[in-house]
C-alpha cells in the first residue's frame, strides 16, 4: 500500500489532465488497502473519484482497465447501470462519483447481507455470457490457496524479521488444514467446477446502498474482475459479512461467524445465482471457510515478510488480522453441519 502524500498542486495537475479544472475540494476517500483514492468536488457540485493505481500490486494497469471497460460495457448493453470509466492517465484514473448512495465497512443487519449477496449474484449472472476473448488474469493465482501456502512457506523459511517463533500456534492451525486447501483449485482443474467471471473482492463496502431503501445501487471496485470461481466470491462474502467484529479486532472473544447472516447471504445469492452447478452448490458452505483461511494465510505471510503488502497501523497489525481470520475459520467449522444444511434447504426451495 502506498503511504505517499500528494501536494494540492500535484493533484490539481493530474485533474487538469482529465479536463477537470474548476476544483473546490480534493480529499482522501474510503478505507481501501491498495490504491490512493480521492474525492473531488468541482464548482458545479459534480463529484468524482480520482485514484492512483498501485502498480506494485497491479503491474498490468492497461489489462485491468481493459477488463473494467469490457465488463461495464457488457452490463450497459444488457440494460444495467455501471460506473462510467471517464479515462485514465498512467497510472491515474477518474470515475464519476455515485451520489445518493453509501457504502458501509461493517455490515449492520441480515437484510444488508441478503441485498449484498444478491447484488453480487446479479453481477456474476449478467457477465455469464460475456463474449470472448477471456478476460485478463490481473492477479494470477489470487485466491489459489495452494499457492498461498507455498508463499507462506517461503516467508517462513526466510523469516526476515525473526517473527516465525512468535506464530507457531497460527502455523500449526494452518498446517492442520493443508489437505483441504486444494479442493476448489483441483475441482476447477478437472472441470468439475467451471471458470466464471468473478469480482474477487466481495466485501460489503463494494456494494453501494441506497440510504433510504437500503437496496443495492451498484457493485464497485472492479480492479480484480477476472476469471475465477464463483465460490471465491461467495466465500469472501461469508468471510466479511458474517463476521461479528472488525477484521483487526484484538479481542478474539468478539470474533465469530453469525449464522443468521450466513443464511441471509445464501438466500440472497441463490435467488439469482441460477448458473451454479451441483459441484458449486456442494462446496458453497466450504468456500467461506477456505477463503477465510486463505486471507489468514495472506496476513500471516505479510507479517513474516515484514509487512510489505497490506497497510499496517502498528507492528503486529497483520498478526492480529491473521488471528481474527483463523478464529473465524474455527467458528465456521464449529457450525459446519448447520451451514451446509442451510445451503441444501435453500437450494431445494429455489
Q: Could you tell me what each predicted segment is?
A:
Residues 48, 81, 93, 196, ...:
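Protein kinase-like catalytic core scaffold
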Residues 231-274, 290-309:
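Active-site activation/catalytic loop segments of kinase-like enzymes and analogous catalytic loops
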Residues 2-3, 27-31, 51-52, 59-62, ...:
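ATP-dependent phospho-/nucleotidyl transfer catalytic cores
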Residues 43-134:
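ATP-binding pocket architecture of kinase catalytic cores
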Residues 21-41:
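ATP-binding glycine-rich phosphate-binding loop
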Residues 191, 205-246:
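Catalytic activation segment of kinase domains across protein kinase-like and atypical kinase folds
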Residues 16-23, 77-81, 273-274:
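Short secondary-structure junctions
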Residues 1-27:
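Juxta-kinase regulatory segment immediately upstream of eukaryotic protein kinase catalytic domains
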Amino acid at each position: 500500500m502506498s503511504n505517499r502524500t500528494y501536494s494540492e498542486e500535484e493533484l490539481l495537475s493530474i485533474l487538469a489532465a482529465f479536463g477537470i479544472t474548476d476544483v473546490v475540494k480534493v480529499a482522501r476517500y474510503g478505507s481501501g488497502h491498495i490504491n490512493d483514492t480521492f474525492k473531488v468536488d468541482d464548482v458545479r457540485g459534480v463529484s468524482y473519484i480520482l485514484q492512483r493505481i498501485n502498480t506494485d500490486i497491479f503491474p498490468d494497469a492497461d489489462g485491468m482497465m481493459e477488463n473494467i471497460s469490457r465488463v461495464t460495457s457488457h452490463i450497459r448493453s444488457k440494460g444495467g447501470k455501471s460506473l462510467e470509466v471517464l479515462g485514465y492517465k498512467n497510472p491515474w484514473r477518474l470515475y464519476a462519483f455515485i451520489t445518493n448512495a453509501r457504502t458501509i465497512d461493517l455490515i449492520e443487519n441480515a437484510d444488508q447481507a441478503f441485498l449484498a449477496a444478491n447484488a453480487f449474484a446479479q453481477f456474476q449472472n449478467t457477465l455469464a455470457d460475456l463474449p470472448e476473448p477471456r478476460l485478463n488474469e490481473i492477479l494470477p493465482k489470487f485466491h489459489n490457496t495452494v499457492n498461498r501456502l507455498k508463499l507462506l512457506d517461503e516467508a517462513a523459511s526466510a523469516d526476515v524479521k525473526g517473527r516465525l517463533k512468535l506464530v507457531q500456534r497460527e502455523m500449526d492451525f494452518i498446517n492442520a488444514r493443508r489437505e483441504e486447501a486444494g479442493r476448489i483449485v483441483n475441482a476447477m482443474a478437472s472441470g468439475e467446477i467451471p471458470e466464471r467471471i468473478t469480482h474477487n473482492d466481495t466485501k460489503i463496502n463494494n456494494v453501494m446502498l441506497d440510504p433510504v431503501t437500503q437496496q443495492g445501487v451498484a457493485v464497485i471496485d472492479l480492479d480484480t474482475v477476472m476469471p475465477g470461481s464463483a465460490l471465491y466470491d461467495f466465500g469472501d462474502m461469508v468471510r466479511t459479512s458474517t463476521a461479528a467484529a472488525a477484521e483487526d479486532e484484538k479481542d478474539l472473544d468478539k470474533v465469530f461467524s453469525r449464522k443468521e447472516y450466513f443464511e441471509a447471504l445464501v438466500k440472497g445469492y441463490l435467488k439469482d445465482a441460477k448458473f451454479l452447478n451441483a459441484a458449486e452448490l456442494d462446496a458453497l458452505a466450504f468456500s467461506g471457510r477456505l477463503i477465510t483461511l486463505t486471507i489468514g494465510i495472506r496476513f500471516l505471510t505479510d507479517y513474516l515478510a515484514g509487512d510489505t503488502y497490506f497497510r499496517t497501523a502498528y507492528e503486529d497489525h497483520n498478526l492480529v488480522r491473521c488471528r481474527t481470520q483463523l478464529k473465524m475459520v474455527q467458528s465456521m467449522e464449529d457450525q459446519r453441519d448447520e451451514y451446509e444444511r442451510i445451503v441444501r434447504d435453500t437450494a431445494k426451495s429455489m
